[in-house]
């Protein structure tokens, strides 16, 4: 199956409920209500920084797509909204545009429609692992130029690759390749998961190279489930995808794991379905959060701006009801954890 067909499959499946698996455990994070907040709602200021760049909210558009005509239209709409709201935006994996230059435009529309916001390039770890240093540097330079990227993300998607019919489960030497990416990019490096989470052991290894870790935890879009749904004629892929679709670290737990060993910038993603979930992620210690599936679905339904406005409003309400004026103050809000998250933290020897 061609990579362009695969990209469109991912769009339709990711926007459907079939791709949504497990729980991110945000329902296990209760922010204590402040009946006497001693602030006005108008006092709340969501502005913050994203790896040093000023942005209007601690919220961004997560990695989604690129490489097909449909993907290009989606990216253009996402970019326009990101520019309007002053929030960062990831693009989807740029590999397709690096091997098929005729589809570069599906990514270039992002810099054309969002000239001033931080844009994040996106490359896959298994592909980088197979490139020579010269080829890798060339890919990084092209990916950055394609969208005028402020930062570069490398996604870790071992679970997806090992169940994907066309997968490339090649991860030997990735850590060394990340160092090359950082040197070649000359800008912040984000290392991210795509729905299975990052443990404290992996975060400790990434500390030497990553300027930011995006936890990409379990509880939202599952690329394992997506690949299983795509594998209509491949019984083995369907079988193993069904077996492993709940594999991973829930996002709330992953934030805590990463924060316990990593002092860099932490981005929460995976199963964040509202501004309240985003506020919970910030309370756990994340500096920023992103959403993908709800925004993809909203784009396809013609209500993207309404969805972004709702998320931003929900974050502000959560801040008002906990009595904080700035996003970073959410980390000081008293909270109670449910039994599943508490048990995870205890067994892993992690506090949050």
UniProtKB/Swiss-Prot annotation:
Subcellular location, principal: cytoplasm
Parts forming coiled coils: none
Enzyme Commission identifier(s): 5.3.3.2
Gene Ontology molecular function, alphabetical: FMN binding; isopentenyl-diphosphate delta-isomerase activity; magnesium ion binding; NADPH binding; oxidoreductase activity
Catalytic activity: isopentenyl diphosphate = dimethylallyl diphosphate
Record keywords: Cytoplasm, Flavoprotein, FMN, Isomerase, Isoprene biosynthesis, Magnesium, Metal-binding, NADP
Subunit structure: Homooctamer. Dimer of tetramers.
Protein name: Isopentenyl-diphosphate delta-isomerase
Gene expressing this chain: fni
